[in-house]
Amino acid sequence: MIDDIKNVSVVIPVYNEEESLPVLIERTLAACRKIGKPWEIILVDDGSNDRSAELLTEAASDPEKHIIAVLLNRNYGQHSAIMAGFQQAVGDVVITLDADLQNPPEEIPRLVEYASQGYDVVGTVRANRQDSLFRKLASKTINMMIRRSTGKSMADYGCMLRAYRRHIVSAMLRCHERSTFIPILANTFARKTIEIDVLHAEREFGTSKYSFLKLINLMYDLLTCLTTTPLRILSLIGSVVALSGFLLALLLIGLRLFFGAEWAAEGVFTLFAVLFMFIGAQFVGMGLLGEYIGRIYTDVRARPRYFVQKTVSAATPLTTSLRDEEE
């Protein structure tokens, strides 16, 4: 066992979770106290519309809780909020956790234990998943797309309960693209990874923040920000369509020569049907190209991926605590 972990950071993105926050904070504090190492909890409010920011500020005002509240000025998305938390984290191992309590905070010591064995990334698989059939199917589709696009085989990319080594977090912070999917980005830099089963509970408070449209947007993000495979597939489809059109033209010319002009006149509707199919394929291709170009434009503008409006913490900084202990 390679236990070189001196301190641990826990990063939790929060968006409209005022109902679950009191329980979340209590359970996370209890789990962190079992680690046996200095720790900090970084709660990032991703532009919530409810009292989440107020509750986070109140919790961070208690120095005994070791909580840092990071308040973003608006909603930037889950992964950007986690990146904002990474920017504040100083732990040798950084744990990410959703605020909905579907993955229990009690798993945190277990993740730290696996990380202490030398793993760069400790991923998790939701055992006995308590989600709707639609969410399960969407998750399986996304996982399959990721495996095919990146070639990295992991069972559950959608579970955000994960542990990352310090050098992995530092590498991710050096990446400045606007569209980011953290589990995949982390695996890009990781040498040694592992996945473990964790419990998955039903959501007790509120509703899921991932609607049908947000899941569709997530799929587009994954397709366009992680790989150029869709463009290659589009080129292949274009080649097949062009070849099919050429062969169809030869067929129609032959039929006209053998059956006369009357048949050609009756085949106008067939030609229109084929033409509309080609036009539809072109629009799909143009939309995909537009998605890539739009992301290039967004990255070229080089605007920050998030803006921290306020940071609240009454606890002694983790690095200072360690320095005092060493002295």
From Swiss-Prot:
Family indicated by similarity: Belongs to the glycosyltransferase 2 family.
Name used for this protein in its record: Undecaprenyl-phosphate 4-deoxy-4-formamido-L-arabinose transferase
Membrane topology per record: Multi-pass membrane protein
A Pfam family per the record: Glycos_transf_2
Described purpose of this protein according to its UniProt entry: Catalyzes the transfer of 4-deoxy-4-formamido-L-arabinose from UDP to undecaprenyl phosphate. The modified arabinose is attached to lipid A and is required for resistance to polymyxin and cationic antimicrobial peptides.
Entry EC no(s): 2.4.2.53
Catalytic reaction equation(s): UDP-4-deoxy-4-formamido-beta-L-arabinose + di-trans,octa-cis-undecaprenyl phosphate = 4-deoxy-4-formamido-alpha-L-arabinopyranosyl di-trans,octa-cis-undecaprenyl phosphate + UDP
Keyword field: Antibiotic resistance, Cell inner membrane, Cell membrane, Glycosyltransferase, Lipid A biosynthesis, Lipid biosynthesis, Lipid metabolism, Lipopolysaccharide biosynthesis, Membrane, Transferase, Transmembrane, Transmembrane helix
NCBIfam families: PRK10714.1
